[in-house]
């Protein structure tokens, strides 16, 4: 996600955003609310006198419209967020229109009051876009390429070539050591690593990696490709390894929190679930981590419930708020528990 403009007075005002990934479109679904004013470039039929005489000739023109949000629908498999409502700025004011927000679309969102979790979601998505979540090492005998997976494609970080000489085994170890040294300097702590390439060199390197950097190597997996270099990087992307890693990373975080919650519930320990119990725990300042399903958050806001007051109270008490995706199993489990739960600093009774 890229923020292209931020114009706020206190909590009121406009933030312009360009969606760079499918995740960004999903984030926008929970940032934009009913009643917001959203601007974007879109296509709309331009009626004229000649068009009315020949209706089959009516063409759509590109215009910038501002619509008051009434409905939203996220089409995951079409990579599109549809925002529907009456036009307030631009041509055909008062008529209804649907904005199709896709990867690469820039939109401006104007709110009377931006909420903490919405601003935090933007910040987290923006920071995620700046650091590589996945690093690819494409390696074959004597040659290796390291690339960062960015939202806009693959950034080639370095090319490493094994020196030539008679001491082949020693040179191979030196070659592997150079790759590991570069990974130590280049790879963020939370990044996963895909080791790709033809033949068995990648397995030999992974073994060396585990021996020299076991913690970093624990986040590595291998993928077969027919070559290295940019073509090898593209093969990794086509095979879906990067998409699986990104999804599994989120699922792993949410699964871990859900396991902690269910364990505490089973022991009648430091946990609360359902709005009534969570609000009760909040009164005592006991909430350490609030878990809330994205659909519960969206539905609560649409119904005008005091859900944002709960989030604010958690943050004021130095607690953490984690929004779960109901697209994955941990989020589904949370939704079945009432959509909201909390891991507590201490047990609360009564």
Curated annotation (Swiss-Prot):
Its main location: cytoplasm. Its EC number is 3.1.-.-. SMART domains: eRF1_1 (SM01194). Keywords: Cytoplasm, Endonuclease, Hydrolase, Metal-binding, Nuclease. GO terms for cellular component: cytoplasm. SUPFAM superfamilies: Dom34/Pelota N-terminal domain-like, L30e-like, Translational machinery components. Its cofactor is a divalent metal cation. InterPro entries: eFR1_2_sf, eRF1_1_Pelota, eRF1_2, eRF1_3, Pelota/DOM34_N, Pelota_arc, Ribosomal_eL30-like_sf, Transl-rel_pelota. It is found in: Cytoplasm. It is an enzyme of class 3 (hydrolase). One of its GO terms (molecular function) is metal ion binding. NCBIfam families: pelota. Belongs to the eukaryotic release factor 1 family. Pelota subfamily. Monomer. This is Protein pelota homolog.
């Amino acid at each position: 996600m890229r923020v292209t403009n931020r114009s706020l007075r206190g909590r009121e005002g406009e933030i312009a955003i360009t969606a760079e990934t499918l995740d960004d479109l999903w984030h926008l679904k929970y940032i934009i609310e009913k009643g917001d004013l959203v601007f974007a470039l879109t296509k709309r039929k331009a009626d004229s006198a000649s068009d009315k005489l020949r209706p089959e000739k009516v063409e759509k023109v590109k215009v910038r419209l501002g619509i008051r949000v009434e409905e939203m629908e996220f089409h995951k498999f079409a990579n599109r967020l549809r925002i529907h409502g009456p036009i307030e700025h631009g041509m055909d004011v008062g008529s209804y229109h649907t904005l199709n927000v896709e990867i690469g679309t820039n939109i401006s969102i104007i709110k009377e009051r931006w909420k903490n979790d919405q601003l935090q979601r933007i910040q987290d998505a923006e920071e995620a876009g700046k650091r590589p979540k996945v690093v690819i090492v494409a390696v074959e005998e004597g040659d290796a390429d390291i690339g960062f997976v960015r939202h806009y494609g693959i950034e080639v970080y370095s090319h490493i070539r094994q020196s030539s000489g008679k001491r082949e085994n020693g040179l191979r170890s030196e070659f592997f050591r150079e790759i590991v040294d570069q990974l130590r300097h280049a790879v963020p702590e939370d990044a996963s690593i895909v080791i790709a390439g033809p033949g068995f060199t990648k397995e030999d390197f992974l073994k060396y990696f585990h021996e020299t950097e076991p913690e970093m190597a624990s986040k590595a997996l291998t993928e077969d490709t027919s070559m290295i270099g940019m073509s090898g990087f593209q093969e990794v992307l086509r095979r879906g390894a990067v998409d699986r890693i990104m999804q599994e990373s989120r699922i792993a975080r949410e699964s871990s929190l859900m396991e902690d919650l269910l364990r505490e519930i089973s022991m009648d320990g430091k946990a609360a679930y359902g709005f009534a119990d969570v609000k009760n725990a909040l009164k005592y300042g006991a909430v350490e981590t609030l878990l809330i399903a994205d659909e519960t958050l969206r539905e609560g806001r649409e119904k005008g419930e005091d859900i944002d007051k709960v989030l604010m109270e958690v943050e004021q008490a130095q607690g953490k708020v984690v929004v779960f995706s109901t697209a994955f199993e941990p989020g589904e489990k949370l939704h079945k528990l009432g959509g909201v739960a909390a891991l507590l600093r201490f047990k609360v009774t009564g």
